[in-house]
Curated annotation (Swiss-Prot):
EC class (word): isomerase
InterPro entries, per database record: His_Pase_superF_clade-1 (IPR013078), His_PPase_superfam (IPR029033), PG/BPGM_mutase_AS (IPR001345), Phosphogly_mut1 (IPR005952)
Pfam families (alphabetical): His_Phos_1 (PF00300)
Name of the featured protein: 2,3-bisphosphoglycerate-dependent phosphoglycerate mutase
Binding site for substrate: 8-15, 21-22, 60, 87-90, 98, 114-115, 183-184
Annotated site residues (Transition state stabilizer) in this chain: 182
Sorted UniProt keywords: Gluconeogenesis, Glycolysis, Isomerase
Species of origin: Borrelia recurrentis (strain A1)
Length: 250
C-alpha cells in the first residue's frame, strides 16, 4: 500500500481579493501562511514524513511546500518543480474579480469558465505581457506548449504525463511523496486517479492548505482518500471555494 499527500497552496493575496490568478505569480496572504503552517502541523502530528516533493513554478505553491517541510523539519528533501503542475491558465480573465465578472457576464457563464471541462476563457494575445512566453522562468519550454488560455481538459493533458513520468515513478520506487500545487492542477490529478466524470469534476472543491491523503494499491489505484484535520473546518473551506464565483451582494 502506498500513500500520496496532495496539498493545494494556502490562500494567496489574489484568492483573498477574489481575483482570477492562473499563472500570475502571487504570494501567500497572511491567512495562507497560517494555513500552510497548520497543514504542516497536522502532518507532523499524524506522523508523516517525505522523501521527495513536487510543486509548480509558482511562488504560492512553492512557499506552501517550504512552510510545510519546515514544520516537519524536512527542508532538506529533494523538490522537483514543473510548469505542468501550474494552475490552469485563465487567459484574459487573469487579474479580474470573480464576483464582479459574474455580475457582468452572469454566474452561469463564469461557472462554465471556472469549472467546465472543455470551455476555456478568452485567450491572452501573445503580445500581452501577461503571456507566459514573456516570463523567463519558462524560457526552456517550447513556446508552442505555453498556453494562452486553458480549460480543465487542457490542464489534465499536461498534468497526467508528469504524473506518469515523475510522480508515479517516485511512488513505485518506494518514496514518500507530497505534491504542493493548485486547485485545478490537483483537480486534474484527482479526476485521473478517481476516474471521475466530466460532470462530477465540476462539483469538486479542493480547499486551501488542507492535506489530502490518497491510499493507493500496488497499481496506484485509489483504495481510499481523506483530508487531515477538523471536519467542520474542512467543510467550511470547501464551501468557501464553491462560493468564489458567485455575484457580490449589493
Amino acid at each position: 500500500m502506498y500513500k500520496l499527500v496532495l496539498v493545494r497552496h494556502g490562500e494567496s493575496k489574489w484568492n483573498k481579493e477574489n481575483l482570477f490568478t492562473g499563472w500570475t505569480d502571487v504570494k501567500l496572504s497572511e491567512k495562507g501562511v497560517s494555513e500552510a503552517c497548520e497543514g504542516g502541523r497536522i502532518l507532523k502530528e499524524e506522523g508523516y514524513s517525505f522523501d521527495i516533493a513536487f510543486s509548480s513554478m509558482l511562488v504560492r505553491a512553492n512557499d506552501t511546500l517550504n512552510i510545510i517541510l519546515c514544520e516537519l523539519g524536512q527542508s532538506y528533501i529533494d523538490v522537483e518543480k514543473s510548469w505542468r503542475l501550474n494552475e490552469r491558465h485563465y487567459g484574459a480573465l487573469q487579474g479580474l474579480n470573480k464576483a464582479e465578472t459574474a455580475e457582468k457576464y452572469g454566474e452561469d457563464k463564469v461557472l462554465i469558465w471556472r469549472r467546465s471541462y472543455n470551455v476555456p476563457p478568452m485567450p491572452l494575445d501573445e503580445s500581452d505581457k501577461r503571456h507566459p512566453i514573456h516570463d523567463s522562468r519558462y524560457k526552456n519550454i517550447p513556446k508552442s506548449e505555453l498556453p494562452s488560455t486553458e480549460c480543465l481538459k487542457d490542464t489534465v493533458a499536461r498534468v497526467i504525463p508528469y504524473w506518469t513520468d515523475k510522480i508515479a515513478k517516485a511512488i513505485l520506487e518506494g518514496k514518500r511523496v507530497i505534491v504542493a500545487a493548485h486547485g485545478n492542477s490537483l483537480r486534474a490529478l484527482v479526476k485521473y486517479l478517481d476516474n471521475m466524470s466530466e460532470e462530477d469534476i465540476l462539483k469538486l472543491n479542493i480547499p486551501t492548505g488542507i492535506p489530502l491523503v490518497y491510499e493507493l494499491d500496488k497499481n496506484l489505484k485509489p483504495v481510499k482518500h481523506y483530508y487531515l484535520g477538523d471536519e467542520d473546518k474542512i467543510k467550511a473551506a470547501m464551501e468557501s471555494v464553491a462560493n468564489q464565483g458567485k455575484k457580490i451582494d449589493r
